[in-house]
Structure formats: structure tokens, C-alpha cells
Design a protein with these regions (language model features):
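Short S/T/G/P-rich N-terminal loop/turn motif that feeds into the first structured element of a domain
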Residues: 1-54, 63-73, 96-105
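A common structural junction motif
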Residues: 29-31, 76-81, 88
Length: 105
């Protein structure tokens, strides 16, 4: 069963250009160094009025739960998590299956 892992990031102060570039650099490492994911996207919100303070969204897909767990435990992901938390970011994560029960269109 494939699944989607989404994380919203809320930093107390907006990242400057260097901070955003570093965040993107770290995420760009994942496919080659962690593996196991079938899709990775990282984007900044284009509408701050509706985000409740979340500036970025991370979108990933995995073929199964063991691949998600391996990603979460991988040292490269742990390094990214430390980087995010050191900036007093409040991440909000949501995981759900990509199957016939979640298809709308």
C-alpha cells in the first residue's frame, strides 16, 4: 500500500534566502542518500492569509510503511529534523494511504 507523508512547517520568523536555500539543499539530498520514496516536493505557500503561520509544505510518497519508517529513522532525515527544530519550527505531519478509499477524482 502506497502512502503520502505531508509536513507543514511553521517557523517563528520567516527564513531568509540562505535559510530557504539550505532547507531545499537538505531535502534535495534525500532521493540519492535516503531513497525509498517515489515523490518529493517542497514548496513555499503563495497565500499567507490561509496558512495559519505555516510557510512551507513537504510532500513525499512512499511505497509502503516500512519505507516511511526507514526514511524517518535515516541519519540524513534526522539531521534535517534537528536543523528544523533548532530554528524553533513547529512541524505538523500527516500520513495517509494512497488507495481506493482516498481517491476522490
Amino acid at each position: 500500500m502506497s502512502l503520502q507523508h505531508i509536513v507543514l512547517f511553521s517557523f517563528p520568523t520567516d527564513l531568509d534566502a540562505a535559510g530557504e536555500a539550505e532547507m531545499r539543499r537538505q531535502v534535495a539530498r534525500w532521493p540519492g542518500e535516503i531513497g525509498g520514496m517515489t515523490a518529493v516536493r517542497l514548496g513555499r505557500s503563495i497565500n499567507d492569509e490561509r496558512t495559519r503561520g505555516h510557510q512551507f509544505l513537504l510532500y513525499t510518497e512512499f511505497p509502503d510503511v516500512p519505507a516511511l519508517v526507514a526514511y524517518q529513522q535515516h541519519p540524513v532525515h534526522q539531521e534535517f529534523l534537528r536543523w528544523v527544530l533548532e530554528r524553533q519550527c513547529t512541524p505538523l505531519a500527516f500520513d495517509y494511504p494512497l488507495d481506493e478509499t482516498t481517491v476522490v477524482l
